[in-house]
Amino acid sequence: MPTHEHTQWRTLALMETRLALDAETKPQLKTGTLVIARGENTYVGRSDYGIEYEGAQVRSILACFSGTRTCSEIAHELACDLDNVTSLVAELDALHFLDTQKSAIVLSDRYRAPGADPISDSGLCDDNLDATFQQIKSRIRPELSLTTWGPEVRDGGVSLMSARQDQPVLIYGNSRIAILLYGILLSSGLSQTTLISDEPSRLIGDIDLCGGFLRLSDIGSSQNERITNIRPELSLFPLNCAGSKNPREIAISVGPPTPELLQMWMSECIPHLFIEDPECASITIGPLVIPGTTPCWRCTALTQDDEHIAWTEVQWQRRIAPRHETPVSVAHHVAGLAALELLHFIDTGNSDLLGSTFRINYLSAIDAKYRTFLHHPACGCRW
């Protein structure tokens, strides 16, 4: 039994959870959840929150939470009351420390050998004879350690990872950030990611080498050809030659987009994320726009134009001025943050960048400025 007092919201959550669980549930502790013996008591949780139980039997029950045995099997094996097992499962599930469902990642357009195990411990449709499956099992584990902690996720994050395969993402740009972001998204499971350069004939140069996947031997090669050739190596999942099953694209503009692109994204209701060109020793990520729902890029522009006398003139000068590359450390930082927010949006439908911007100062990257915008009355994005 827990040693701390139950709050009302936990009691209600526990009652709802028990209704969804039964004796055939196969509980598994989420990745990173700690079970620590404290004398006769047992602590379950992590460094920032957890719960402590009295009695040695709880520890024996927890040791069986591996996802391979049902609650009834655990109770029979330990010769304990089934209600004790299901009550423990319900409470830990309400605290989001357990996975209680099984899902499988089915790779798009892949042959499966007869008799292959439908679900492995990693959540993959397993095939011991397929080297691709074995490689993916190793690469997917770190990704699942993130997705399993998402809200209402009870299958280890497997279904979220599986859905990423069919989500098309278009990255517009050819800067360090754009190229790094392309590699990160492919390696994170977004196999339908495409990098679209505004210079189709651009060659890889010295400045493109920034600790990413481009090498010294790539200098002088066509950027488009190299990006296309490296794609199968970067992608977590095999590429689906049949194309995406998800019709809703997501666009990312690294640098200023053309008016034609902006109009297309808004008119076709394509969610889009902005990553501005660097300005002096700072750079802005956002907003992430859902057309017709959240404030658009023009809303943010009109708001800032109201606040700063020369804002419009400054923006025009920035568009015609020579572009400058970001420092290597900043490029990796920005690409990583943008990728995390985009993945969170794809997985959950939510993001801190919806209608908001994140301005990073190179000299104090931790002390970034987060700002939320409202729909501007002079903008017609909601008319």
Which positions does each model-derived feature cover?
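Adenine nucleotide-associated cytosolic modules
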Residues: P2-W383
